Amino acid sequence: MAGKELKQCQQQADEVTEIMLNNFDKVLERHGKLAELEQRSDQLLDMSSAFSKTTKTLAQQKRWENIRCRVYLGLAVAVGLLIILIVLLVVFLPSGGDSSKP
């Protein structure tokens, strides 16, 4: 009887050992996956930083482009108004000649 109980205890100990080894393998596998996830998250962080820098640079370029466009438009309007003013002055101001004297 003692031999049977000893055999049963040994079998249970072997089962526990096998379960513990399986758990250890799972822990190692999980550690590998966590390391991979950490590496991927670091890469994503680097990529997001680069993206943020690029968007700030692009926004600044677009802002200056918009300002430049407004300046050109303002200059075009000013030149157009100046031309209209010169034409009106030439047409409506009396000329230096005495064409109105009898």
From Swiss-Prot:
It is a single-pass type IV membrane protein. Residues 5-65 form the v-SNARE coiled-coil homology domain. Induction: During myogenesis. Belongs to the synaptobrevin family. This is Vesicle-associated membrane protein 5. Residues 94-102 are vesicular. SUPFAM superfamilies: SNARE fusion complex. The keyword Ion transport does not apply. One of its GO terms (cellular component) is plasma membrane. The chain crosses the membrane at residues 73-93. It comes from the Eukaryota. Preferentially expressed in the skeletal muscle and heart, detected at lower levels in several other tissues but not in the brain. InterPro entries: Synaptobrevin-like, Synaptobrevin/VAMP, V_SNARE_CC, Vamp5, VAMP5_R-SNARE. Keywords: Cell membrane, Coiled coil, Developmental protein, Differentiation, Golgi apparatus, Membrane, Myogenesis, Phosphoprotein, Transmembrane, Transmembrane helix. The keyword Cell inner membrane does not apply. Signal peptide: none annotated. It is found in: Cell membrane; Endomembrane system; Golgi apparatus, trans-Golgi network membrane. It holds the Pfam family Synaptobrevin. May participate in trafficking events that are associated with myogenesis, such as myoblast fusion and/or GLUT4 trafficking. Gene3D superfamilies: 1.20.5.110. GO terms for biological process: cell differentiation; Golgi to plasma membrane protein transport; skeletal muscle tissue development. Residues 1-72 are cytoplasmic. The modification Phosphoserine is found at S41, S48, S49.
